């Protein structure tokens, strides 16, 4: 399984708008993409505030999160992570 992690730092004062964009735009687009099995939103309300979207894929994703038209994020990045099983031997 492949996990894609998208992380974005939210512009001060735009946290609620940023989370709403991820919920209403980004998650549905990801879930409608071929191979996407699940999506999970994580938030950090400290300084700086940030939003993380974890998506799980059965194939290497061909997916770009893009950015909304408004200024919600000061920085965003994505990376693919491969899941490994723990070795308890």
How should each PLM-predicted stretch be described?
Residues 2-8, 40-68:
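Short, well-ordered beta-strand segments in beta-rich or mixed alpha/beta enzyme
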Residues 17, 48-49, 88:
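A broad, structure-centric signal for solvent-exposed, well-ordered loop/edge residues
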Residues 24-37, 56-89:
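An amphipathic, aromatic/His-enriched active-site/gating alpha helix that lines ligand/cofactor pockets
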Residues 1-3, 18, 34-35:
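Short, flexible segments with low predicted structural confidence
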């Amino acid at each position: 399984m492949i996990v894609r992690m998208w992380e974005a730092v939210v512009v001060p004062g735009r946290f609620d708008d940023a989370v709403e964009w991820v919920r209403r735009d980004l998650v549905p687009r990801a879930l409608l993409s071929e191979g996407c099995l699940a999506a999970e939103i994580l938030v950090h309300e400290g300084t700086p505030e940030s939003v993380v979207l974890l998506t799980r894929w059965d194939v290497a994703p061909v997916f770009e999160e893009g950015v909304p038209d408004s200024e919600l994020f000061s920085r965003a990045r994505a990376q693919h992570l491969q899941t490994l099983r723990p070795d308890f031997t």
